[in-house]
Amino acid sequence: ERKHHKYFLRFSYTEEVTLSKTAVKQQVICSVDLGINTDAVCSIMRADGTILGRKFINFPSDKDHLYHVLGRIRRFQREHSSRQVQSRWDYAKRLNMELSRKIAAEITKYAAEYQADVIVFEYLEMQGKISGKKKQKLHLWRKRDIQKLCEHQAHRNGIRVSMVSARNTSRLAC
């Protein structure tokens, strides 16, 4: 693979990992609520509903850096053409991807800390046209990347990942 005038080797490999086979009644669950303002809220609970812990995952300095870069892009686009701003958009994209990696790592670390058997995400589907003030925030929200990265890291640690319907999850959460 050639990138930035340098050559790199990339090897693919498979890894055999046994996922936890705990009975449903004895499982420890890590439920994750991905948000726009707070990056994620993790709740550790038993199958009977006993809450063992809760953690708010937020990286405000990283998000502030990203929004600062987006403001610089906005100012630059006003003065120049949008073609000349591609490198700045690439930088913002890399910052956003790094933020999603940090969030996924923090979720997996928290689940492993409590020896969770399964991590549960809500299945978030975005349909239709987005308008209004939070349009850019929603477009930059890397919910699917966070879920994929977290799934990969969790499977390497032997933790299962499950998706549930997003309907009524916030209303029914205690």
What feature does the model see in each segment?
Residues 1-3:
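Short amphipathic beta-strand and strand-loop transition segments with alternating hydrophobic
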